[in-house]
UniProtKB/Swiss-Prot annotation:
One of its GO terms (biological process) is FtsZ-dependent cytokinesis. It is found in: Cell inner membrane. Residues 78-101 are annotated as: Disordered. The chain crosses the membrane at residues 5-25. It is a single-pass type I membrane protein. Residues 1-4 are periplasmic. Belongs to the ZipA family. The keyword Transport does not apply. Interacts with FtsZ via their C-terminal domains. Keywords: Cell cycle, Cell division, Cell inner membrane, Cell membrane, Membrane, Transmembrane, Transmembrane helix. This is Cell division protein ZipA.
Amino acid sequence: MDLNTILIILGILALVALVAHGLWSNRREKSQYFENANTFGRANRQDEPISTPESYKQARNVAPAFTQPKQAVIHQEPPVQQPLNTEPEPITQETPVRAEPQSVDQIKITLPNVEPAPAESAPIYEMRPSRRNTEPQYYQQPSEPYYQQPVQQNLARQTIADIEATVDPNEGVNSSSEYLRTQLQEASQEGNQIFTQSPLSRAPLQQPIEFDQPAQQEKESDNNEDEDVSFVMLYVAAAENRQFQGTVLVQALEDLGFSLGEDNLYHRHLDLTVASPVLFSAANITQPGTFNPYTLHEFFTDGVAIFMRLPSPGNDRTNLKIMIRSAKTLAQQLGGFVLTEQQELFTDAAEEEYLAKIK
């Protein structure tokens, strides 16, 4: 026989032996499992008590623990046994008394260890006839309003202390009195006559009339400032058929040093702080010309106007160069154009003209 045939036969025998061994070991494990289960069942049956009819009845009578509510144990005295010969007492039914509403005056509050105060008797009022004359009295009312007649003295020649001493303090001096007006008019005429007759009145006045100079100077300075103030303006406009979005525009302005300030405009300060003076400002071209920080995500505009007030804090020419540089940078970042005040393209020639205006 060949060696290959011998090897094949040996392999087949080995497989048959393995299969037979596996079946035998499987059957053996099953038999052990059933034996263990039987022994475990017998042990449980031996541990359980044998139930009797009496125990079954007791189990039925006893309710589960969760169904019986726990009640508090109350110790009660045993009822008193009454003799049989005693007659039952008649049962009296109390009719409910209807509670009538009581007034506040009928409610009484008593305190312990305090004697009740004697009830105060209601006051008795007696109607006595009036001693006055019951007949009606008639008074003649003047047609004109009545005023206290002033003292027949010339009030114009009296001092303030004399007038206050003679006048009622509650009413004061009656300035509508014709008598007082007549006296004041006469006194003024006499004063004018004395002034015209006095030789001092003919002399020229040596002292000039003094006016409130600070107030007048302030008004003149304000007028001069209004006349001298001028503005330099540039426009940063979006491309045709395009607009600047609010958040993008504000971010570009803040990158250039602008900050939201007075009148809801963006201002460029001298030291980049709010406390420093404003060099130039940026306003919205679209009405009302301001920036609402709460609606920037919905905000679109055609452009902004950058303007500087002259004279400005510091060097006007240097500030104008900073403004021109800021406008060019803003237009480059947003993809727009810089325009002059006449809304023309801001070229190098226009820049030289702007700088030439500033001395």
